[in-house]
Amino acid sequence: MLESANECAYAVAEHVGGTVENFVQMMNDKAAELGCVNTHFNNPHGLSEGEDATLHYTCCYDMALIAKAAYQNETFRAITATKTYQIPPTNKHDEITYLQNHNEMIHAFKTRGQYLYEYCVGGKTGYTTAANSTLVTFAEKDDMTLICVIMNAQSPAQWTDSIALYNYYFENFSLYNVAQNETRLENGEMDTGMLNTNSSFVKIDPAGNIVLPKSAEFSEAAPAVSYDNTSDDVLANIRYTFAGHDVGGADIVSTGVKADTFSFD
């Protein structure tokens, strides 16, 4: 990943999928599972020449969905944050192989640090003649982890645009923990259908967050409770909208308290 070694992409594809074709199908299946609607992979490395030019494509939104899923993987996070790496001598190569991350936002690769960004924690560069310079990055500040996707950029716009977008978001938006700020649920001011939230057996999952403009109050976010994605522990879901946009949510979960009966309205 650090050096964009396409031959390694083929090796991974054959190791994981058995064949390159099977692995590419796995890639497309995973993209569909993540909710991608404008993506189709035709190879494991990303180059799109010849036949691949029409069969291998994606968009910024879909790539952000894929990046979000990838960032959940601890090994991926470690690799994408690595600035330099040394491969020791092997039976095929008797010298150390030095690798450098091409992401100028975390490592001064060619630009002498001109585009280093203190909040960037990883990312991946790309380039094809059709897509021009592309860049997916991750940045963390004030408990927020953001993903930025830039495509069809004329260098150095992939760096400058990413930094400008991150700065705008960090300066104008804040993260709110739902469990710490939501009072309408326990006060009975939220339409929850049949679930009786006055019960001591339910609570809001503390992992849930929403993002709002710094000029807005948490109470201005409109909640909606659904039962679409439930499990043994997740009893319901709250999603919030602000100015017509989904801004995050949280699960309503069981407190783990055992009872002979469970309270519903």
Regions found by a protein language model. Name each.
Residues 14-75:
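Mid-domain, small-residue-enriched loop/turn segments at the edges of structured enzyme/sensor domains
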Residues 1-5, 12-16, 42-46, 79-83, ...:
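Active-site-proximal beta-strand/loop segments in catalytic clefts of secreted hydrolases
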Residues 2, 32, 99:
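Cell-wall glycan
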Residues 2-9, 56-60:
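Short alpha-helical patches at coil-to-helix transitions and adjacent helical residues
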Residues 4, 19, 23, 157:
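Catalytic cores of large soluble enzymes that bind and process phosphate-bearing ligands
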Residues 10, 28, 119:
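Short glycine-/small-residue-rich flexible loop motifs, especially phosphate/cofactor-binding loops
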Residues 36, 54-265:
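Domain-terminus/edge residues, biased toward the C-terminal soluble/receptor-binding domains
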